[in-house]
Amino acid sequence: MWKRWLALALVAVAWVRAEEELRSKSKICANVFCGAGRECAVTEKGEPTCLCIEQCKPHKRPVCGSNGKTYLNHCELHRDACLTGSKIQVDYDGHCKEKKSVSPSASPVVCYQSNRDELRRRIIQWLEAEIIPDGWFSRGSNYSEILDKYFKNFDNGDSRLDSSEFLKFVEQNETAINITTYPDQENNKLLRGLCVDALIELSDENADWKLSFQEFLKCLNPSFNPPEKKCALEDETYADGAETEVDCNRCVCACGNWVCTAMTCDGKNQKGAQTQTEEEMTRYVQELQKHQETAEKTKRVSTKEI
């Protein structure tokens, strides 16, 4: 019998202590604001501090976070943000809608201006590192001489560097060529070739897709600022990275040119597959390029008039 009374007494003491701690915490934390996902706690020294909420109330009011994750309520979202140290906001009320997965092949592999400029920056950095100042009794190598050396090493004898020769030149430096935008290595290899083409286009004054030494020198001149080219379509101009669609194919603006996929449409796009042949797709891309050329000619004429 006495054991039963002892147990009841211990429970009563524990309850009293808990009540006292709660009153003490309420008093210490009365003027402390911790923000969403955090709550005030009392340290061993009796000082207030803000910690992530230990447990949220289980009421159901689902919300979708900006990270694409569904939470039971607002409290759980802010608690997760606190625990992970990340910024998560309420995107909308309710469960997150399932996002349609986009196949990697849904977008064409392209070299954006940022990719082109990054490759160019790395090449210039590599070449500048090979500059040797003149010594007391020896002659060094300046930037133009270093470029001349590489130009002659990779030129096949026609005094021009085509895209394959330019690519071989760039491949001499691991850091310069190591552009990895895509998870697939084959796509990254294709990207390097496309960015080399984009570099050639920068200074290819006679549009023969080959660079003379003077064009090569201009392309990699550290003081040269590559222009930001836009794509034209239906009297509108689009910035680098802009996209448009035709049936199930996607076209992307990259370095001033429209680049499109050439997928065979099926399912809901079956009609497109039946009506649009490969030849028609080619014509569509050519039409995009004509819009681009027309816009550039108009721009040049306007510049001359000014």
Curated annotation (Swiss-Prot):
Residues 28-51 form the Follistatin-like domain. Residues 231-285 form the VWFC domain. Its main location: secreted. Residues 46-98 form the Kazal-like domain. Pfam families: EF-hand_FSTL1 (PF23564), FOLN (PF09289), Kazal_2 (PF07648), VWF (PF23244). Residues 1-18 form the signal peptide. GO terms for cellular component: extracellular space. Secreted glycoprotein that is involved in various physiological processes, such as angiogenesis, regulation of the immune response, cell proliferation and differentiation. Plays a role in the development of the central nervous system, skeletal system, lungs, and ureter. Promotes endothelial cell survival, migration and differentiation into network structures in an AKT-dependent manner. Also promotes survival of cardiac myocytes. Initiates various signaling cascades by activating different receptors on the cell surface such as DIP2A, TLR4 or BMP receptors. Homodimer. Interacts with SCN10A. Interacts with DIP2A; DIP2A may act as a cell surface receptor for FSTL1. Interacts with BMP4. Interacts with CD14; this interaction promotes TL4-mediated signaling cascade. This is Follistatin-related protein 1. It comes from Pongo abelii.
